[in-house]
Amino acid sequence: MENRKATEAGQDVTMQKEDFAVLWKTIHLKVTDTYEVPPEILWVNGSTIGTLGNFSASTGKAKSKKTFNISAIVAAALKNDEVLKYSAYLPPNKRKILYVDTEQSKYHCHKVMERILRLAGLPTDKDRDDFVFIVLREQTPDKRKQIIGYMLENMPDVGLLIIDGIRDLMYDINSPSESTDLINLLMRWSSGYNLHIHTVLHLNKGDDNTRGHIGTELNNKAETVLQITKSTQDGNISEVKAMHIRDREFDPFAFRINDSALPEAVDGYVFKQPSQDRGFPLAELTEQQHRTALENGFGKQVIYGYENVLKTLKQGYASIGYKRGRNIHVDLNKFLVNKRMIVKEGKGYRYNSDFHY
């Protein structure tokens, strides 16, 4: 049995010379090579959130109006103009948009499609060649990936792929191997077909972390992760901010659903500043203070269990003179996770020394 496993493992890692020669041409980077800057296609208030050859994501809890926000992005891309706070420009040879929904019925998907066309100022009584909408609710995760892959292979002019429900392309959102494979697939699709992929994933109910191991992988690899949150001041308003972004961070904005059932910007909206405990200015601590506290608390360990993570934070930050109660350490944990100063590893959390403060 062990010999058979070893043989199978060997087959996975052994590569023929001819196969490697072909692969070498695609993986070898030389300083004399020249590469074009990836074309920018999506912006928010002047900040780039999407380029060809990359992928991004929208996250939010249930009822935060994630799909309304996605509708504005797609409408902007359809008209190559501005919708809500999103601006888009798809090159002439990349004008087609493929929208994949894995969650809703055809009735509800049809409402989304009509909403997008109305946002773009386009007629809803005429089909368009540059906007293809498919409903994969009834398919298995493997079949969904096969269908998307086949369509991309046979539709070379797709510039924007929307996947509303990335978790439905996998069986277990907490599987590290399945999550890695899916993110690698997104990267192959985006670079291989020179398009931008925008996905949708839920946030955990109890905190502001993206759901499952797939959420961790998204945060690590995505060009931009947008967070859509229902306003605590007005339940009819949703707030949009950058959870992670490679370009400069844009000012958050808010939108509501108007009488025509379309999202519209809420001008003059004042964002409520998150409350912080007096004497514990999370964002005002220096980078070195955070590093010292986390090194003293976590070291190189992976800490398992939420309460153990809080205990580790309490010990680490006490070592630099910050002794606070449990509620503050709950807020501190959220702050550190959002800043990727501590990251999920398997079912535990570890200190990430490679963070940017």
Model-predicted regions and their roles:
Residues 1-9:
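TOPRIM fold recognition
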Residues 91-174, 334:
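Conserved inter-motif catalytic segment of the P-loop NTP-binding fold
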Residues 76-80, 116-119, 169-172, 189, ...:
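Conserved, well-folded catalytic cores of nucleic-acid-processing
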Residues 72-73, 108-116, 147-150, 181-185, ...:
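Alpha-helical scaffold elements adjacent to nucleotide-binding pockets in ATP/GTP-utilizing enzyme cores
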Residues 12-116, 354-355:
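The Walker A/P-loop phosphate-binding site
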Residues 3-4, 14-17, 154, 231-357:
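C-terminal regions of RecA-like/P-loop NTPase motor modules
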Residues 55-63, 177-264:
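Phosphate-binding/switch region of NTP-binding enzymes
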Residues 50, 89-92, 124-126, 153-155, ...:
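Conserved catalytic network of the ASCE P-loop NTPase/AAA+ motor domain
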